[in-house]
Design a protein with these regions (language model features):
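Conserved GNAT acetyl-CoA-binding A-motif
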Residues: 137-150
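A short helix-loop-beta-strand connector motif used in the catalytic cores of GNAT acetyltransferases and
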Residues: 79-92, 111
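Conserved beta-hairpin
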Residues: 89-101
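A short, internal acetyl-CoA/4′-phosphopantetheine-binding micro-motif in the GNAT/acyltransferase core
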Residues: 115-122
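Conserved acetyl-CoA-binding loop-helix of GNAT-fold acetyltransferases
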Residues: 123-136
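Conserved active-site alpha-helix within GNAT-family acetyltransferase domains
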Residues: 149-173
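Conserved GNAT-fold acetyl-CoA-binding loop/helix
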Residues: 52, 56-80
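A short beta-loop-alpha structural element at the N-terminal edge
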Residues: 38-53
Length: 181
């Protein structure tokens, strides 16, 4: 609904961060938990550059090694296209003011276009929180993604299934997938 689109969508959660102190022999002395306040919120025009930087740096680190030069260039052209970026909705996972992860969808939230978490924050539940937020705030019964080969296990863990075999378009390798609510 139009009214629903105007409201500010946010979701907060608490995440525990664990630090283990050990002596010189490796014996655990104590465990310290630090609770971090995390928030998912819409990324606006003033924050989009940070989101694109996070996407690009994470892509270069984890996905580009599996792509041809043409594929890397195609992805770069995609994320640098102001016309394309204007058609997408970007949501960020923030710890205070630090952007730790991004999920971007088409306007109707039926298709995931980008889904990245900074390397040092992966495997901490940030991607899951972004996904949960999208799933809860999409009116679509089916959400699709063209997953990179690197991210297939992540999407499977989130409940997506493959809808076809690996495809290649403009040097970009992907596996079409879908999630049914």
């Amino acid at each position: 609904s139009a009214a629903g689109d105007r409201k500010v969508l946010r979701k907060e959660w608490l995440q525990k961060k664990l630090a283990i102190l050990c002596d010189r022999k490796g014996t655990v002395i104590t465990k310290i938990y630090e609770v971090l306040s995390m928030e998912v919120k819409k990324i606006d025009d003033t924050q989009i550059t940070n989101a694109i930087d996070l996407i690009w740096q994470t892509f270069l680190q984890f996905e580009a090694p599996d792509y041809s030069e043409e594929g890397v260039k195609s992805f770069q052209d995609f994320i640098e296209s102001k016309e394309i970026i204007k058609t997408l909705e970007f949501w960020g996972a923030y710890d205070e003011e630090e952007l730790k992860g991004v999920i971007a969808t088409n306007e109707n939230r039926k298709h995931i276009c980008c889904f990245f978490v900074k390397a040092q924050y992966q495997r901490q539940g940030i991607g899951r929180k972004l996904w949960d937020f999208l799933r809860e705030n999409s009116s679509s019964k089916t959400i699709t993604v063209n997953s990179s080969p690197y991210a297939v296990p992540v999407y499977h863990k989130l409940g997506f299934i493959d809808t076809d075999t690996e495809q290649l378009s403009d040097g970009i390798r992907y596996i079409p997938m879908k999630f049914e609510k």
